[in-house]
Amino acid sequence: MKKPTSAPRSKAFGKQRRKTREELNQEARDRKRLKKHRGHAPGSRAAGGKPASGGGNQNQQKDPRIGSKTPIPLGVTEKVTQQHKPKSEKLMLSPQAELDLLETDERLDALLERLEAGETLNAEDQAWVDAKLDRIDELMQKLGLSYDDEEDEEEDEKQEDMMRLLRGGN
């Protein structure tokens, strides 16, 4: 009888054959040739990176940098565009004029009346009143004016001094 034939065994489990120098060089050339063709096509940066496919598609994809939708008049126009004027700084008033404005300020008068009536103002109004009163004091000092109350006190002191002198100098 015939002996059963065994299947041929693969040589994968055995010792692998070393590649020769020529085979290694050829594989390196193949890798280099494949590597050369990697990357973008030349001119892709200027073309927008999208390959043109189809003739009808070109009308839709126009370069947005070219042209403008707004019409530009080429002739001389009669209408002159008004230039925006920058806001001028506040006019500097003379100290006397500024003092007159502050003394006739309705808001300041109303808030001072509320204070005299015993009401308490919120912080914002109180700060505003204080600032305006300080400004009035500065302007009065610049102009050499003084409060009527101070003048009355000075007159009273002068009269008292006169009375002391008349009575005997004590």
From Swiss-Prot:
One of its GO terms (molecular function) is GTPase activator activity. The keyword Zinc does not apply. Residues 147-159 have a biased composition (Acidic residues). Residues 20-30 have a biased composition (Basic and acidic residues). Residues 31-40 have a biased composition (Basic residues). Residues 1-96, 145-170 are annotated as: Disordered. GO terms for biological process: ribosome biogenesis. Keywords: GTPase activation, Ribosome biogenesis. Belongs to the YihI family. Interacts with Der. A GTPase-activating protein (GAP) that modifies Der/EngA GTPase function. May play a role in ribosome biogenesis. NCBIfam families: PRK05244.1-1. HAMAP family: GAP_YihI (MF_01058). This is Der GTPase-activating protein YihI.
